[in-house]
């Protein structure tokens, strides 16, 4: 620690030494849901639709066709290296849609080049390259139904934050077994040091004259697939 910083902290401690003792933080909030699974999933669906996301139900047998429909016939889209390949359309160069597979990037920034479906080994896409991509398809870590919030934490099936912020269209897969009701339940499933991105609907802001503008801080289109892996 520098001498200047140490001096600043010393003065702060000295100035606040005689201050009042803070009241203890109340932690009597709910930590576990009492609702059944169907209620929790419906709560998440209602919240996401209210936030102007589209929501559809799929199984592992139908999810690839659903993603193909959502992307359209000519999309150029990026997927993280760890996403289940069986969930994706069987796209190849010259077949209309083009899939770009990004390498896995750990929390420390360490890169592991991977061989994509048809792209060979590649480095992570630059921001300029991502700006030329139509969409991104990822999975998710956990979703909080109470707030309608999807958590991404940089896992191999979600990729780094940039790929979910720059493209204008995000197709996000939410496995039903990852849906919880309460925020404390969601945080309990998140690695403490993970880079967390929380998504509650398409990107939108009303900062200027309270007029809603979409797509300022991320994708303006969010399609959520509630994936039932038990069927």
Language-model segment annotations:
Residues 1-231:
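The feature marks the mature, well-folded catalytic cores of soluble enzymes
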